[in-house]
Amino acid sequence: ESHALKLLDEHNQTIEPTIKSHHGRIIKHIGDAIFAEFDSPADAVDASIIFQNKFKERNSLSRREDHIQIRVGLHKGEVVVKDDDLFGNAVNIGSRIESIAPPGSIAISHEIYESLDVDLYSIRSMGHVKLKNIKSPQQVYKLYLDKNEFEAESENELQQSHIERGIDIIDPQTYEENEI
């Protein structure tokens, strides 16, 4: 248990300053997860890339049982602020996107994708995904840490990883026709 707490402390010491230095605000800790908001989507993406790369480098020098691999899910939308917390459908979508991100990676919503200068990043569509307790399928993208990582994984390999992890890719047109 003390080993797990040591890893959690290292996790927080890596993520928290990066969030703050990228115009982010930590809303709360939820177990080993951190819920944060940022001034802009680009700030959120850049912070996420930095701490994912820090964990990647750290893991390359650590024993496997000491690896820290986190999932990042980013979404942009309207929220309700109450008692220094955030609520609303946008919060739920962000949380659900995080849950489908492969360990050690970043998944972003279409709203984040549209607000970025996508030429600055390596991004591949993960397709439309039905997220738990979210009415309509969401277009989700995998944001790669660098060009090499992007080139190392084909679109087919990304789709295959969804199948292996039980993530359903949905044709939104067919889905809407079946819902009517």
List where the protein language model places each region.
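Intrinsically disordered or compositionally simple regulatory linkers and C-terminal tails
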Residues: L143-I180
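Juxtamembrane/interface motifs at transmembrane-helix termini
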Residues: R25-I26, E65-H67, L158-Q159
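Catalytic NTP-binding/metal-coordinating core of nucleotidyl cyclase/transferase enzymes
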Residues: E1-A47, N53-K54
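Catalytic beta-strand-to-alpha-helix segment of the class III nucleotidyl cyclase homology domain
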Residues: F35-L145
